[in-house]
Every structure is written in C-alpha cells, then in structure tokens.
Swiss-Prot record:
Keywords assigned by UniProt, alphabetized: Endosome, Isopeptide bond, Lipoprotein, Lysosome, Membrane, Myristate, Palmitate, Phosphoprotein, Ubl conjugation
Protein name: Ragulator complex protein LAMTOR1
Position(s), cross-link Glycyl lysine isopeptide (Lys-Gly) (interchain with G-Cter in ubiquitin): 20, 31, 60, 103-104
Membrane topology according to the record: Lipid-anchor
Family: Belongs to the LAMTOR1 family.
Region (Disordered): 1-43
Keyword Kinase recorded: no
Post-translational modification: N-terminal myristoylation and palmitoylation mediates its recruitment to lysosome membranes, thereby promoting localization of the Ragulator complex to lysosomes. N-myristoylation by NMT1 is required for palmitoylation at Cys-3 and Cys-4. May be palmitoylated by ZDHHC3. Ubiquitinated at Lys-60, Lys-103 and Lys-104 by UBE3A, promoting its degradation by the proteasome. Ubiquitination at Lys-20 impairs the association with the lysosomal V-ATPase complex. Deubiquitination at Lys-20 by USP32 promotes the association with the lysosomal V-ATPase complex and subsequent activation of the mTORC1 complex.
Top-level division of the source organism's lineage: Eukaryota
GO cellular component, as recorded: azurophil granule membrane; extracellular exosome; ficolin-1-rich granule membrane; FNIP-folliculin RagC/D GAP; late endosome membrane; lysosomal membrane; lysosome; membrane raft
Gene Ontology molecular function terms on file: GTPase binding; protein-membrane adaptor activity
Species in which this protein is naturally found: Homo sapiens (Human)
Length: 161
C-alpha cells in the first residue's frame, strides 16, 4: 500500500500536502450517509483511493484511542467521572460477554495434591501397560461387534379409518 521514506533535503510540495492530509485531524471520516463503508472502487484514481483509505483508517484509530495523559483527574467533576466509569464498565461488559465460552470450560482435574511425589515415584511396569492395552483392545472389538437386528417394524399402523 505504501512505504516509509525519510529524506532530510528532499521535501516536495506534494509530499508536504500528503503529510498534511494524513495528519489533519479536522478532516471528517469518509462514511456514507447510511453508515456503510465508502466504495473505494468508484473513485477516479488510485491515489485518491489510497488517501481515502488512509483517512478512514486514521479516523477509526483516532476514535478508538483514549488519551490518558490529557485527562486531568483533579479537574474532572464528579458526574464526569461517574459517566466515564459507567461508559468503561459497559465497554468491558460487552467485551467480556464475548469471552463467555472460556468461562464454560471445566478446569483441569486435580487428581493429586502433591504432583511432585507422583512424578518422583517408580514408573508403571511394562507388563501392566500391556495388560491395559489388551483389555482396551478386547473392549473395542466387543463394542464393534454389537449389531442391532430389526425383528419387527418400529412403526405399527393401526386400522383407523
């Protein structure tokens, strides 16, 4: 889309004008009347297209920034402080509601209160592991051989006229 270029002695009028357009906060964001994003493909040139896109990105970024250094907490009145606190609380509630799926996951089970003792103990003998594997294979084969045979119809038609 663009590149960063810096030169101390080369500064054309066009570069100054582009910098002024990008850094000018008084320019309104480019939105259509219905609130939809503007159609960048209908603009006559690619340069205007890039400028409009950069202006909209800059406007969105500027609207989402909270300047903490500009807020003087001593000069703020009580009702302004309460309004901001309410606004931040609603923003946090909206953001935290999208994270509810993380709260629904069950925590990992705690099988022991002293895992260091479990990890330091002797390993499970190989014969026990083989026996568990044989039992699991036997259970799998038994479950895979279960078949349901239909002996009669599941839906019986009654002779109701």
């Amino acid at each position: 889309m663009g590149c960063c270029y810096s030169s101390e002695n080369e500064d054309s009028d066009q570069d100054r004008e582009e910098r002024k357009l990008l850094l000018d906060p008084s320019s309104p964001p480019t939105k259509a009347l219905n609130g939809a994003e503007p159609n960048y493909h209908s603009l006559p040139s690619a340069r205007t297209d890039e400028q409009a896109l950069l202006s909209s990105i800059l406007a969105k970024t500027a609207s989402n920034i909270i300047d903490v250094s500009a807020a003087d907490s001593q000069g703020m009145e009580q009702h302004e402080y309460m309004d901001r606190a309410r606004q931040y609380s609603t923003r946090l509630a909206v953001l935290s509601s999208s994270l509810t799926h993380w709260k629904k996951l069950p925590p990992l089970p705690s099988l022991t209160s002293q895992p260091h003792q479990v990890l330091a103990s002797e390993p499970i003998p190989f014969s026990d592991l083989q026996q568990v594997s044989r039992i699991a294979a036997y259970a799998y084969s038994a479950l895979s051989q279960i078949r349901v045979d239909a002996k009669e119809e599941l839906v019986v038609q009654f002779g109701i006229p």
